[in-house]
Protein backbone atom coordinates (compact mmCIF):
# COMPACT_ATOMS: atom_id res chain seq x y z
CA UNK A 1 0.00 0.00 0.00
CA UNK A 2 1.45 3.35 -1.06
CA UNK A 3 0.39 6.47 0.77
CA UNK A 4 -1.90 8.50 -1.47
CA UNK A 5 -2.16 12.24 -1.80
CA UNK A 6 -4.65 13.42 0.80
CA UNK A 7 -7.07 16.13 -0.32
CA UNK A 8 -8.63 17.42 2.89
CA UNK A 9 -10.87 20.07 1.33
CA UNK A 10 -14.26 18.34 1.78
CA UNK A 11 -13.91 16.03 4.78
CA UNK A 12 -17.12 14.10 5.52
CA UNK A 13 -17.64 12.35 8.86
CA UNK A 14 -20.59 10.06 9.57
CA UNK A 15 -21.91 6.75 10.79
CA UNK A 16 -25.34 5.17 10.98
CA UNK A 17 -26.05 7.09 14.21
CA UNK A 18 -26.26 10.27 12.16
CA UNK A 19 -29.38 8.85 10.47
CA UNK A 20 -31.13 7.67 13.62
CA UNK A 21 -34.53 7.48 11.91
CA UNK A 22 -33.19 4.95 9.39
CA UNK A 23 -32.32 1.28 9.51
CA UNK A 24 -28.63 0.39 9.27
CA UNK A 25 -29.02 -0.50 5.60
CA UNK A 26 -30.84 2.74 4.82
CA UNK A 27 -28.28 4.79 6.71
CA UNK A 28 -25.44 3.05 4.88
CA UNK A 29 -27.09 3.87 1.54
CA UNK A 30 -27.47 7.53 2.53
CA UNK A 31 -23.82 7.74 3.58
CA UNK A 32 -22.76 6.08 0.33
CA UNK A 33 -24.69 8.67 -1.69
CA UNK A 34 -22.94 11.50 0.15
CA UNK A 35 -19.53 9.87 -0.37
CA UNK A 36 -20.29 9.92 -4.10
CA UNK A 37 -21.45 13.56 -4.02
CA UNK A 38 -18.02 15.14 -4.34
CA UNK A 39 -16.37 14.83 -0.92
CA UNK A 40 -12.62 14.20 -0.81
CA UNK A 41 -12.34 12.30 2.49
CA UNK A 42 -14.79 10.06 4.32
CA UNK A 43 -14.23 9.23 7.98
CA UNK A 44 -16.09 6.17 9.25
CA UNK A 45 -17.21 7.28 12.72
CA UNK A 46 -19.92 5.05 14.14
CA UNK A 47 -19.94 6.01 17.82
CA UNK A 48 -23.44 5.42 19.14
CA UNK A 49 -24.43 2.90 16.48
CA UNK A 50 -25.83 -0.35 17.85
CA UNK A 51 -25.03 -3.51 15.89
CA UNK A 52 -26.60 -6.93 16.32
CA UNK A 53 -23.15 -8.47 15.99
CA UNK A 54 -19.62 -7.28 15.32
CA UNK A 55 -19.41 -8.74 11.82
CA UNK A 56 -22.30 -6.45 10.82
CA UNK A 57 -20.09 -3.47 11.64
CA UNK A 58 -17.23 -4.87 9.59
CA UNK A 59 -19.55 -5.51 6.65
CA UNK A 60 -20.86 -1.93 6.67
CA UNK A 61 -17.35 -0.50 6.96
CA UNK A 62 -16.23 -2.65 4.02
CA UNK A 63 -19.16 -1.48 1.90
CA UNK A 64 -18.42 2.17 2.60
CA UNK A 65 -14.73 1.64 1.99
CA UNK A 66 -15.51 0.14 -1.42
CA UNK A 67 -17.80 3.07 -2.27
CA UNK A 68 -15.03 5.45 -1.22
CA UNK A 69 -12.43 3.69 -3.35
CA UNK A 70 -14.69 3.72 -6.40
CA UNK A 71 -15.38 7.44 -5.89
CA UNK A 72 -11.71 8.31 -5.42
CA UNK A 73 -12.36 9.33 -1.82
CA UNK A 74 -9.83 8.68 0.96
CA UNK A 75 -11.27 6.31 3.59
CA UNK A 76 -10.36 7.11 7.21
CA UNK A 77 -11.36 5.12 10.31
CA UNK A 78 -12.13 7.00 13.52
CA UNK A 79 -10.27 5.79 16.63
CA UNK A 80 -10.38 2.03 15.94
CA UNK A 81 -6.82 1.05 15.06
CA UNK A 82 -7.61 -2.64 14.70
CA UNK A 83 -10.45 -1.95 12.26
CA UNK A 84 -8.23 0.39 10.26
CA UNK A 85 -5.59 -2.33 10.02
CA UNK A 86 -8.09 -5.04 9.13
CA UNK A 87 -9.51 -2.91 6.32
CA UNK A 88 -6.10 -1.59 5.26
CA UNK A 89 -7.75 1.83 5.38
CA UNK A 90 -6.17 4.94 3.90
CA UNK A 91 -5.94 6.41 7.37
CA UNK A 92 -6.81 6.49 11.05
CA UNK A 93 -7.98 9.53 13.03
CA UNK A 94 -7.51 9.72 16.80
CA UNK A 95 -8.40 12.12 19.60
CA UNK A 96 -6.53 13.49 22.59
CA UNK A 97 -7.79 10.74 24.92
CA UNK A 98 -6.84 7.87 22.63
CA UNK A 99 -3.43 6.22 22.37
CA UNK A 100 -0.52 8.50 21.55
CA UNK A 101 0.36 9.24 17.94
CA UNK A 102 3.67 7.38 18.31
CA UNK A 103 1.99 4.22 19.63
CA UNK A 104 -0.65 4.29 16.90
CA UNK A 105 2.06 4.88 14.30
CA UNK A 106 3.88 1.75 15.49
CA UNK A 107 0.70 -0.24 14.88
CA UNK A 108 -0.35 1.17 11.51
CA UNK A 109 3.03 1.90 9.91
CA UNK A 110 4.14 4.84 7.81
CA UNK A 111 1.87 4.18 4.82
CA UNK A 112 -1.38 4.97 6.62
CA UNK A 113 -2.45 8.57 7.13
CA UNK A 114 -2.67 9.50 10.81
CA UNK A 115 -4.89 12.39 11.85
CA UNK A 116 -5.12 13.96 15.30
CA UNK A 117 -7.83 16.13 16.85
CA UNK A 118 -6.82 19.29 18.72
CA UNK A 119 -9.12 21.58 20.68
CA UNK A 120 -6.91 24.41 21.95
CA UNK A 121 -3.62 26.26 21.44
CA UNK A 122 -1.58 23.99 23.73
CA UNK A 123 -2.72 20.83 21.95
CA UNK A 124 -2.04 22.45 18.59
CA UNK A 125 1.50 23.36 19.64
CA UNK A 126 2.25 19.86 20.95
CA UNK A 127 0.77 18.28 17.83
CA UNK A 128 3.31 19.98 15.56
CA UNK A 129 6.00 17.49 16.57
CA UNK A 130 3.70 14.56 17.34
CA UNK A 131 4.22 12.74 14.05
CA UNK A 132 0.63 13.24 12.89
CA UNK A 133 0.12 13.73 9.16
CA UNK A 134 -2.75 16.18 9.55
CA UNK A 135 -4.85 17.78 12.27
CA UNK A 136 -8.53 18.39 12.90
CA UNK A 137 -9.15 21.53 14.95
CA UNK A 138 -12.37 22.40 16.72
CA UNK A 139 -15.08 22.74 17.59
CA UNK A 140 -15.00 26.14 15.93
CA UNK A 141 -18.65 26.88 16.69
CA UNK A 142 -21.17 25.25 19.06
CA UNK A 143 -22.21 21.86 17.73
CA UNK A 144 -24.88 19.26 18.40
CA UNK A 145 -23.21 16.51 16.35
CA UNK A 146 -20.86 15.42 19.15
CA UNK A 147 -22.06 15.05 22.72
CA UNK A 148 -18.51 15.19 24.09
CA UNK A 149 -17.41 18.27 22.15
CA UNK A 150 -15.02 20.71 23.83
CA UNK A 151 -15.64 24.43 24.29
CA UNK A 152 -15.96 26.24 20.93
CA UNK A 153 -12.77 28.02 19.84
CA UNK A 154 -14.40 30.82 17.87
CA UNK A 155 -13.21 32.30 14.60
CA UNK A 156 -11.05 35.04 16.18
CA UNK A 157 -8.95 32.68 18.32
CA UNK A 158 -8.79 30.11 15.55
CA UNK A 159 -7.30 32.66 13.18
CA UNK A 160 -4.51 33.39 15.71
CA UNK A 161 -3.90 29.71 16.45
CA UNK A 162 -3.48 28.87 12.78
CA UNK A 163 -0.55 31.30 12.55
CA UNK A 164 1.42 28.82 14.68
CA UNK A 165 0.45 25.76 12.64
CA UNK A 166 2.69 24.05 10.09
CA UNK A 167 0.66 20.89 9.39
CA UNK A 168 -2.24 20.22 7.01
CA UNK A 169 -5.35 21.05 9.03
CA UNK A 170 -9.13 20.86 8.79
CA UNK A 171 -11.65 22.83 10.81
CA UNK A 172 -14.63 21.11 12.43
CA UNK A 173 -17.62 21.88 14.60
CA UNK A 174 -20.86 23.73 13.97
CA UNK A 175 -20.00 24.63 10.38
CA UNK A 176 -22.92 25.95 8.33
CA UNK A 177 -23.27 27.33 4.82
CA UNK A 178 -23.29 30.82 6.34
CA UNK A 179 -19.86 30.31 7.92
CA UNK A 180 -18.10 28.95 4.83
CA UNK A 181 -16.87 32.32 3.59
CA UNK A 182 -15.17 33.41 6.81
CA UNK A 183 -13.66 29.95 7.30
CA UNK A 184 -12.26 29.86 3.78
CA UNK A 185 -10.01 32.86 4.36
CA UNK A 186 -8.06 31.87 7.48
CA UNK A 187 -5.67 29.19 6.27
CA UNK A 188 -7.54 25.91 6.67
CA UNK A 189 -6.83 23.09 4.22
CA UNK A 190 -10.34 21.73 4.49
CA UNK A 191 -13.59 21.63 6.41
CA UNK A 192 -14.79 18.54 8.26
CA UNK A 193 -18.56 18.36 8.43
CA UNK A 194 -21.27 16.02 9.63
CA UNK A 195 -24.74 17.58 9.69
CA UNK A 196 -24.01 20.08 6.90
CA UNK A 197 -23.97 17.08 4.56
CA UNK A 198 -26.17 14.53 6.34
CA UNK A 199 -29.02 17.05 6.56
CA UNK A 200 -28.50 18.59 3.12
CA UNK A 201 -31.24 18.29 0.51
CA UNK A 202 -28.55 18.44 -2.16
CA UNK A 203 -25.23 17.08 -0.77
CA UNK A 204 -23.53 17.46 -4.15
CA UNK A 205 -24.23 21.19 -4.19
CA UNK A 206 -22.99 21.60 -0.62
CA UNK A 207 -19.82 19.58 -1.27
CA UNK A 208 -19.13 21.66 -4.35
CA UNK A 209 -19.67 24.86 -2.38
CA UNK A 210 -17.19 23.79 0.32
CA UNK A 211 -14.59 22.78 -2.24
CA UNK A 212 -14.90 26.02 -4.18
CA UNK A 213 -14.52 28.11 -1.03
CA UNK A 214 -11.48 26.19 0.22
CA UNK A 215 -9.62 25.86 -3.08
CA UNK A 216 -10.31 29.49 -4.01
CA UNK A 217 -8.47 30.68 -0.92
CA UNK A 218 -6.04 27.78 -0.57
UniProtKB/Swiss-Prot annotation:
Pfam families: TMP-TENI (PF02581). InterPro entries: Aldolase_TIM (IPR013785), ThiamineP_synth_sf (IPR036206), ThiamineP_synth_TenI (IPR022998), TMP_synthase (IPR034291). Its EC number is 2.5.1.3. Pathway: Cofactor biosynthesis; thiamine diphosphate biosynthesis; thiamine phosphate from 4-amino-2-methyl-5-diphosphomethylpyrimidine and 4-methyl-5-(2-phosphoethyl)-thiazole: step 1/1. Mg(2+) binds at residues 79, 98. Keywords: Magnesium, Metal-binding, Thiamine biosynthesis, Transferase. CDD domains: TMP_TenI (cd00564). 2-[(2R,5Z)-2-carboxy-4-methylthiazol-5(2H)-ylidene]ethyl phosphate binds at residues 143-145, 174, 194-195. It comes from the Bacteria. 4-amino-2-methyl-5-(diphosphooxymethyl)pyrimidine binds at residues 43-47, 78, 117, 146. SUPFAM superfamilies: Thiamin phosphate synthase. It catalyses: 2-[(2R,5Z)-2-carboxy-4-methylthiazol-5(2H)-ylidene]ethyl phosphate + 4-amino-2-methyl-5-(diphosphooxymethyl)pyrimidine + 2 H(+) = thiamine phosphate + CO2 + diphosphate; 2-(2-carboxy-4-methylthiazol-5-yl)ethyl phosphate + 4-amino-2-methyl-5-(diphosphooxymethyl)pyrimidine + 2 H(+) = thiamine phosphate + CO2 + diphosphate; 4-methyl-5-(2-phosphooxyethyl)-thiazole + 4-amino-2-methyl-5-(diphosphooxymethyl)pyrimidine + H(+) = thiamine phosphate + diphosphate. Its cofactor is Mg(2+). Binds 1 Mg(2+) ion per subunit. GO terms for cellular component: cytoplasm. Belongs to the thiamine-phosphate synthase family. Condenses 4-methyl-5-(beta-hydroxyethyl)thiazole monophosphate (THZ-P) and 2-methyl-4-amino-5-hydroxymethyl pyrimidine pyrophosphate (HMP-PP) to form thiamine monophosphate (TMP). HAMAP family: TMP_synthase (MF_00097). This is Thiamine-phosphate synthase. The lineage of its organism: Bacteria, Bacillati, Bacillota, Bacilli, Lactobacillales.
Amino acid sequence: MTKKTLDLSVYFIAGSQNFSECSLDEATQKIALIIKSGVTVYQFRDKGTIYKEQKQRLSIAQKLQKVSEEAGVSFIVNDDVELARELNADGIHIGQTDESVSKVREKVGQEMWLGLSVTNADELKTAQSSGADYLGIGPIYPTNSKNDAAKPIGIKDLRLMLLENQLPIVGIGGITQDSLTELSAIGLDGLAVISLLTEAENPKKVAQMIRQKITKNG
